[in-house]
């Protein structure tokens, strides 16, 4: 018996040690590598700094790679914005601080964060009426005021806040990609789409209308729908035909959702733009053919809007289970193979992806400084990311937006890299405001709000308490195996050792 107990203790310790120390970042030297250091940000999270010399095929670079296992039940990975609305820009640090304050009762303590999706700007796609802006050969106005939107499919803690950039949001450069994660820590990289349909339940034989997108620019020849997460109004031009739908409950837009409401107003050309508010949706049609499709819908009608995420057949149904998702630029590695591109732009870069064993890695590389770090040529990134150990990886965003933030204490953070934007005195490192951030948090169960116990009959035997979960569905304090949580492995080993005397004593009083 003693031998069995000793064996189990050793096994538990070995498992916990393996879980703590097993990381997937390749230790193979990169061409021209002159220095590499790794620090543990907290148990289960490493940050590796790699320096490449000027003779490297990838040029002079300073880069950082963060690695962790998203399946660890004590970790939580979310995509979020810095304010109440998705149109609010904020620095990564301010977003992290706002996130921590909003989630303190859930025990979420941010550990590291990076910048997220690319977004629409007033000097490009979101051309403001009367500004005279021209971009990519297009000069037609799109909005009445500034409208900053993520350009990819973005999901914040289970709620879809934007569908991907559409063909009519001019100019349409390319199909955008997205990286998603499920509640149990599985990841997916692909090119998902969001199908949206509007149906009028008050009209017999009404032919449901396929909508162009969710929380996108109110572009010409589209039918967009806007949720209460996007801002105070749709910023649509005067020629838009808008249908206001009010719901009598707190709706959440997610895959498979059908949201029902009542039409409370219709705003035509010459009318004032309707206002968005909690539990309200607004359908905005532009172009005569599109307006005709929704013109029979009247005030007082009961309507419903359905949402469905779809990816490629190879992805299966995983996109329907994604709880957090960020859009972005270019796929660099897919299923272990570097994906070649001919983009010669050289930029500071932020990338995200997964390793073959399911870990997630962030990559942030500085740039735009010939004496420090020049930045990565996008066409070189597939080879580099493959060498670093990515199984799947894509370029989220770059330029002055590239930011890596990590915790340095209970409520202190530091920017690890040196962003390429300058302060007023000309020095580099000024953090840029971005449309959203990707935040890895540690779940501190000591900070969880304690619910009031429900009264129970004294004669009933109560079942063992189930493992709790946060809003994104990530389990806390349980896992499918010991290796999923280093903390649990250590706890198991310590508890087992503490119980040894009683186990041995009990053994003496029982038969073989």
Regions found by a protein language model. Give the residues of each.
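Sec-dependent signal peptide cleavage junction
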Residues: 17-28, 475-481
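Loop/turn positions that initiate beta-strands
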Residues: 297-305
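Juxtamembrane/start-of-transmembrane alpha-helix segments at the extracytoplasmic/lumenal side
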Residues: 479-491
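C-terminal membrane-anchoring or membrane-association module
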Residues: 489-512
């Amino acid at each position: 018996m003693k031998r069995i107990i000793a064996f189990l203790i050793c096994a538990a310790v070995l498992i916990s040690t393996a879980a703590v120390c097993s990381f997937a970042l390749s230790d193979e030297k990169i061409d021209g590598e002159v220095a590499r250091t790794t620090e543990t940000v907290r148990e289960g999270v490493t940050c590796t700094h790699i320096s490449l010399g000027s003779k490297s095929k990838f040029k002079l670079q300073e880069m950082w790679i963060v690695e962790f296992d998203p399946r660890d039940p004590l970790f939580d990975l979310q995509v979020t914005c810095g304010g109440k609305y998705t149109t609010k820009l904020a620095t990564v640090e301010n977003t992290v601080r706002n996130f921590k304050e909003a989630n303190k009762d859930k025990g979420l303590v941010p550990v590291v964060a990076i910048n997220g999706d690319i977004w629409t700007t007033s000097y490009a796609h979101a051309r403001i009426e009367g500004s005279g802006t021209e971009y990519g050969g297009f000069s037609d106005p799109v909005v009445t005021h500034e409208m900053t939107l993520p350009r990819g499919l973005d999901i914040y803690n289970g709620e879809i806040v934007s569908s991907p950039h559409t063909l009519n949001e001019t100019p349409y450069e390319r199909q955008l990609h997205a990286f998603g994660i499920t509640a149990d820590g599985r990841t997916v990289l692909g090119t998902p789409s969001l199908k949206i349909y509007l149906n009028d339940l008050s009209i017999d034989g009404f032919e449901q209308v396929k909508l162009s997108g969710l929380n996108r620019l109110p572009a010409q020849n589209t039918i967009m729908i806007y949720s209460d997460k996007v801002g105070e109004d749709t910023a649509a031009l005067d020629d838009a035909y808008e249908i206001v739908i009010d719901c009598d409950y707190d709706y959440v837009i997610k895959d498979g959702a059908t949201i029902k409401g009542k039409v409370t107003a219709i705003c035509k050309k010459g009318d004032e733009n309707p206002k968005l508010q909690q539990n309200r949706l607004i359908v905005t049609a532009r172009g005569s053919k599109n307006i005709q499709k929704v013109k029979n819908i009247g005030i007082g009608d009961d309507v419903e809007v359905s949402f469905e995420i779809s990816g490629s057949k190879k992805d299966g149904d995983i996109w329907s289970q994604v709880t957090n998702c960020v859009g972005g630029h270019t796929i660099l590695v897919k299923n272990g193979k570097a994906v070649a591109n001919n983009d010669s732009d050289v930029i500071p870069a932020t990338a995200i992806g997964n390793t073959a064993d399911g870990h997630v890695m962030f990559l942030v590389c500085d740039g735009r400084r010939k004496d420090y770090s020049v930045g990565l040529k996008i066409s070189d990134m597939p080879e580099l990311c493959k060498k670093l150990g990515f199984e799947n990886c894509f370029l989220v965003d770059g330029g002055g937006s590239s930011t890596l933030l990590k915790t340095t204490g209970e409520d202190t953070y530091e920017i690890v890299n040196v962003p390429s934007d300058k302060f007023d005195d000309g020095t580099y490192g000024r953090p840029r405001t971005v449309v959203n951030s990707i935040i890895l948090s540690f779940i501190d169960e000591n900070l969880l709000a304690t619910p009031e116990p429900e009264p129970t009959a004294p004669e009933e035997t109560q079942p063992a308490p189930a493992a709790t979960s946060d809003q994104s569905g990530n389990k806390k304090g349980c896992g499918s195996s010991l290796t999923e949580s280093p903390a649990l492995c250590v706890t198991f080993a310590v508890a087992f050792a503490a119980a040894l005397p009683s186990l041995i004593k009990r053994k003496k009083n029982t038969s073989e």
